[in-house]
From Swiss-Prot:
Residues 345-476 are annotated as: Cytidylyltransferase. One of its GO terms (biological process) is ADP-L-glycero-beta-D-manno-heptose biosynthetic process. Its EC number is 2.7.1.167, 2.7.7.70. Pathway: Nucleotide-sugar biosynthesis; ADP-L-glycero-beta-D-manno-heptose biosynthesis; ADP-L-glycero-beta-D-manno-heptose from D-glycero-beta-D-manno-heptose 7-phosphate: step 1/4; Nucleotide-sugar biosynthesis; ADP-L-glycero-beta-D-manno-heptose biosynthesis; ADP-L-glycero-beta-D-manno-heptose from D-glycero-beta-D-manno-heptose 7-phosphate: step 3/4. SUPFAM superfamilies: Nucleotidylyl transferase, Ribokinase-like. CDD domains: RfaE_like. Residues 1-319 are annotated as: Ribokinase. This is Bifunctional protein HldE. In the N-terminal section; belongs to the carbohydrate kinase PfkB family. In the C-terminal section; belongs to the cytidylyltransferase family. Disulfide bonds: none annotated. GO terms for cellular component: cytosol. It comes from the Bacteria. It catalyses: D-glycero-beta-D-manno-heptose 7-phosphate + ATP = D-glycero-beta-D-manno-heptose 1,7-bisphosphate + ADP + H(+); D-glycero-beta-D-manno-heptose 1-phosphate + ATP + H(+) = ADP-D-glycero-beta-D-manno-heptose + diphosphate.
Amino acid sequence: MKVSLPAFEKAKVLVVGDVMLDRYWVGPTGRISPEAPVPVVKINQVEDRPGGAANVALNIATLGGQVQLAGLVGEDDTAKALTLGVQALGVEPQWLNIADKPTITKLRVLSRNQQLIRLDFEESFDKQDSARLLKQSEALLDSVDVVVLSDYAKGAIDKPQDFIALARAKGVKVLVDPKGSDFSRYHGASLITPNMSEFEAVVGAVTSEADLLEKARGLLNKHQFDAILVTRSEKGMTLVTANAPELHIPTVAREVYDVTGAGDTVISALATSLAAGAELPQACAIANTAAGVVVGKLGTSTVSRIELIEALALHHGESGFGVVSEDQLAYALEQAKLRGERVVMTNGCFDILHAGHVSYLKQAKALGDRLIVAVNDDASVKRLKGEGRPVNQVDRRMAVLAGLAAVDWVVPFSEDTPQRIIARLLPDLLVKGGDYKVEDIAGGAEVIAAGGQVQVLGFEDGISTTAIIQNIMAKQ
């Protein structure tokens, strides 16, 4: 599957659910307590991170999406800490403060990157508190494309059926990270994302792949879901929809340090991708890759757009180097620019690669970090050079160029000039060899208009493909 990122900045998402503060006490341990057989930890670091629905919102914001967050909190210092935590990433929360309840807090004690104990400070919110929260959130539906219901069974999401129905009636997709054994509470949702344990808590033990699909489709029909995405740890994810074959997505995590917040990452990446216009299979692949990144971090964490681009490149091969398609190159170029790399581009027929070409390409590469070589295809070379050319077919010409240390990407084009492909890719620097004037170089005007530069480089005298061909023919 080809996977590329949509325009996350266009995504408008509302997150409603159980917000909490994840607090970490961290320090070394080197002895056992004389009072009980437990380690003694000397705390030297305290860190607060937004968790639950708040972590979902922060993941969306980190990816570049526009997000609103609604949840239940107490009137305490923890609520203030949680507010500061989400505001730090530009999220303005819509809290409903409940005077007689504490803000949910999960305190973890860590030593040597291992969690020793977790202490929970919480009381479930009342049904009327949930009703007030959902009613308050209805006013936000007109300004978003996707809603995420992040349910941790702490009371914020009690009976959301009316809220789901209203959102769907307004054309807003509703994604649910479910909890508990009663999925009827989410009737009519666009997509639910249970993990395997949550799925089996509702449908019973899954005995085979066929059994999983049968039970998932049963839930689709029973509760009028559009889709179910079952997250399956080391087995990846399985997407089941009513009108398409199932989609199995293998896991991409290389190392797993901590699964805390992985479900939040999945649903946030799904929501942001769908709100930005991605199709569901593509959104699932993006979410799967994001989860693979976050489980490699310790504690509740987010995934940045750059981290996601790099992970997609690694696991889906869409921005590898060498001979690439134009679409693959556009994606690779986006990644390179996000890394702050200066991209140089040149073009030519390169029919018989010679020392002059090699010297020229070395000069071009020295002007930046990455070098693109656009190559005329065979029909284009024939139109430009006449009968008998090219001597080498385009796939062979590109393979030789791709083998040069100076060249990062080689891409073909079919027109007589590379103006169109240059205008699409817009490198930082466009170079051309010979005695051209800058204003006469194809694509130069577009590069300059976009803030780039155009430069003419010299060729070595006396070396050309035409001269080589004439010399060979003269010796025959």
